[in-house]
């Protein structure tokens, strides 16, 4: 399960069906600039690849005039068009032009049982595999607006993360969620 709370200044959003280059997909898009801008904020494609993001605020030192995470929506749109698996998404991130202008945590699941969280900056990423007990000892991975690989005590969403983790950990311990 991927779950996202879209806290954005863009109040008009809708779910669109998009005929992609390789795979068709449904995605949450900003109504005001769709389809002119090929941006999506979460979605699922025709082969069961699903992707969402949270803006991270502690991976990149943003320069004056730069928009934080300027490429995040374009990356989601493009990945939904061309990726089928978590491994495909790794390859996608490995081969995009750098600096990527990405600063985000991407949650990814696929129809083959793959599930991972990627903390992505302009040049590199850190992957956390939800199927690996060292990355997800309780069977889940949660993120808000900071990245574990980023600068400590910077970012946002620490209180939300602690609450989400508390709820998920209890549910996991009581059998309320299953990995």
Predicted regions and their residues:
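C-terminal, well-structured catalytic/ligand-binding subdomain of enzymes
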Residues: 1-77, 104, 110-179
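Short, surface-exposed recognition loops or helix-turn segments adjacent to catalytic cores
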Residues: 90-95, 103-111
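Intrinsically disordered, low-complexity linker/loop segments enriched in Gly/Pro
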Residues: 71-99
